[in-house]
A protein has these predicted regions:
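Active-site-surrounding "flap" and adjacent substrate/cofactor-binding loops of secreted or lumenal enzymes
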Residues: 52-74
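Bacterial N-terminal signal peptides
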Residues: 8-14
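Low-complexity intrinsically disordered segments
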Residues: 81-139
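Bacterial N-terminal signal peptides that target proteins for export
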Residues: 1-7
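Boundary of Sec targeting at the N-terminus
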Residues: 20-23
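Short N-proximal segments of mature Sec-exported proteins
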Residues: 26-56
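Residue-level signal for mature regions of secreted extracellular proteins and peptides
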Residues: 28, 33, 43, 72, ...
């Protein structure tokens, strides 16, 4: 009978130990992916460890570009470090406006001007302001 009375206590001890072990201070879920995305999109290289967070970030898509950019900014703001100071808030804003839109292929497509009179296509060399902010961010 005493063994049956101790069973709930043993089970409770096991589950509390498991819960304490799971709370090791590491982020999980979208918070983890958001923090990883901030790090990956802030660096000049994209290692393979960035794939899940970048996939999640770039999978955010809405009908209007402004809605997509706002949703991506909101996703990055899930990371607690994203709002630690004004420079980080500006970095998140610059990332959400520039990431995926400032590579060579995107710029060539968006900055191409076609002259229908002479059938000549010209790519402007003026960098958009969102790319300048993204590339020149203090972080």
């Amino acid at each position: 009978m005493k063994k049956l009375a101790l069973l709930p206590l043993a089970l409770a001890g096991m589950f509390s130990a498991t819960a304490a072990q799971a709370d090791d201070g590491l982020f999980t879920g979208d918070v983890r992916l958001a923090c990883e995305a901030v790090l990956c999109l802030s660096s000049g290289t994209r290692p393979s460890e960035c794939a899940p967070s970048l996939k999640r970030y770039f999978s955010i898509s809405h009908k209007k570009l402004s809605d997509t950019l706002k949703a991506r900014r909101n996703f990055l703001n899930l990371c607690p470090a994203a709002s630690q100071d004004e420079k980080m808030r500006q970095l998140v804003n610059d990332i959400s406006n520039g990431a995926g839109r400032c590579d060579a292929a995107s710029l060539n497509a968006s900055l191409m001007v076609w002259n229908w009179d002479s059938d000549v296509r010209i790519v402007s060399n003026a960098m958009p302001s969102y790319c300048t902010a993204y590339n020149d961010n203090a972080y």
